[in-house]
């Protein structure tokens, strides 16, 4: 009888401990807060790299969870991103494709060791994620191939009204990629002031100019 009482007492104690353990498990919100605190404590301001970079806007926060954002949130992210696009002055979309290729090859910029965060010191590092010119054998595959980008889309003259939609889409994608895909992995070159208007024109020329090797 005494043994039976001991077993019952042990079972009750075990159940109580389990219940207490379950009750002490942090909520998802608490875990998120702990993670943010840990991340912030692991970094410091260094040169041009500031802790402010850890602050997320709506689009970043919405796409950092374990599930895709709800449709209404994704639509809001895209709408706000589309509204943020600044179209090129004078409707001038194209620059020099040669400069665009240099930017596409250049992965420099925005590190703590860089003297300035100004766009002039930044590259676009397009080849990290895309194939562009087939002569380049080193490229990433996170993004789609951009080989023959303009040619495949029938762009023969960027001033032709028939090409307006793809020209404007391409500019918008470079300026703020979240305008067309809420959780796009592509850098928001214009929105984040990573590149200036003229640099974006050069990238546009690389992709759309019929004379660019990309479209041969």
What does each model-found stretch correspond to?
Residues 110-113, 135-139, 213-214:
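Secretory-pathway/luminal and periplasmic proteins that interact with or process carbohydrate-rich
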